[in-house]
Each structure stands twice: as C-alpha cells, then as structure tokens.
Amino acid sequence: LPVEITWWGHATATVRDSGVRVLTDPLFVARLMHLRRRRGALPPPSAAIADVVVVSHLHSDHLHLPSLARLAPGTRLVVPHGARAAVPGLRRLAAVRGLPVTEVRPGDEIAAGALTIRAVPAAHDGRRWPYGTRTAPALGYVIQGEARTYFAGDTGLFDGMARAVGACDVAMLPVGGWGPFLGHGHLDPGRAAEALAELAPRAAVPVHYGTYWPIGMDAVRPHEFHAPGDDFVRRAAALAPGVAVHRLGHGESMRLEAAR
C-alpha cells in the first residue's frame, strides 16, 4: 500500500502508513499569541483523527494544548521526556481527555500498530518559553512501516544528522518557520537542502512555512512568508537532484509507493 502524507500547515501533517494514522505537532487555530494564520483554511475536524500523535518539542506552536484537546479519547501522545513535568497543563489535559502519554528520549522506539516510531535528536531549543527553565529535549521522529518517514520537527543542521536518522524514504523538513530571522536551531531553505543531500531520501515534503506569520509582517515582508517553499524546491534540485520534492498546498497530499 502507498504511504500518504497530508500537510495541514505549519508542522502539522498526517502520515498514513500500514493502516495507522500518525499526526505531527497538531496546531488547529487561526491565531496563536502574535501569530495569525495567513494562508490555508483551518484543517477540518477530520484532521484531528489519529491513532498516535507525535510532538517534537515544547514550543507552543508545536505542543499546543487547545489543539490536543480536540483529539478523541484514547489517542496516544508521544512527547519528549520531561514534557509532563515541564508543561503541567499537558498532564491535566491528558487525564481529563483520556489521552495516554508516552515520553521518549532520542533512540527510544515505540510500537504503534504495525508501525515502529523512533525518536531521534534535533538541534533546537527545548524550553517551553524563551527565558524559562522548563525544558525537554527537542526531537524528530522516524515512522517506519511500509516506508520510513522522517519528521524533523524543528531543527538545525547538526553533525551526525544522517547517521542519527538512518535510511529514510521521505523527509519532512522545516524550511521556513514564522519569522524572518531564523538563526541557530532552524533550517532555512538552503540549510534544509543541505540536510536533504545528507539524508538522501526518495522524496521530501517541505513543512513549517507559509502558514503563520506575525501580525502585520505579511504586509511588510511578504516575500519572506511565501518564498521558502519555492526556494527549497530550487535549492534541493541543485543539491539533491535525485530526490522528488513535493511542495504541497495546505490540505494537499502526496503518496509514495512502498519500496520493493
């Protein structure tokens, strides 16, 4: 069966593999603090239907409690080790909604139906708030079933990235973010293309761009909001020409036939 990836916007996507639905970093709101959703309709209620949800790190645009509250009771949450201690609201929400929580460190593996989900390191600030002390390691995940799908979460390039991830068929890489000034711990289109060349998957899906933008910034610097997806496609063609890049619109899907 083909593996299907649907991008809902930002870092939120559904990976369907081996009859299991894995939802990444769900964010289902029109506004979050100073950010406003500028492109793409809000995901439909069906986007919250999942067998397991993976959360890459504690930042509120990735671990978003009101969006997690839309999950059906019994939906399994996979979060970085220490997340419940760092975010007490997560512990309360999981108890009230009946969401089983599994905390993982880099290298940990869990089974989800016919899938194996392995946590891998990410080079990103793991704190909940920029100046806080509550923290947990930022992670990526490799979802292995008919294919091996790498969801990078939010990360910069780091030594040993390809070794930590291992062989993968699809790489879901962040290429933009929500602001124009992305430094350490992030991938811009150029660095994402470098990561793609190192990872050498069969296919790639750019994520984490062109959805949320600081209020007012879409009028001041619109090119920085729209450009990352197309820029990544161009740079990937130069650095990783053997990789099929799928630049999805919000709510669009790609399919990858299982490797023979």
PLM feature segments, named:
Residues 14-58, 62-70, 79-82, 126-131, ...:
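Pre-active-site segment of Zn-dependent metallo-hydrolases
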Residues 1-4, 16-22, 109-118, 144-149, ...:
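Beta-strand-turn-beta hairpins that frame and shape the catalytic cleft
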Residues 64-74, 88-93, 215-228:
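Metal-dependent catalytic neighborhoods of phosphoester/phosphodiester hydrolases
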Residues 30-31, 118-146, 155-160, 170-172:
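Active-site-proximal loop/helix segment associated with metal-binding centers of metalloenzymes
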Residues 26-28, 58, 82, 120-124, ...:
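Active-site metal-binding loops of divalent metal-dependent hydrolases
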Residues 20, 73-76, 99, 199-203, ...:
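A short helix->loop->beta-strand "cap" motif at the edges of active sites that frequently abuts
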Residues 85, 158-250:
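Cap/insert and terminal regions of metallo-dependent hydrolase folds
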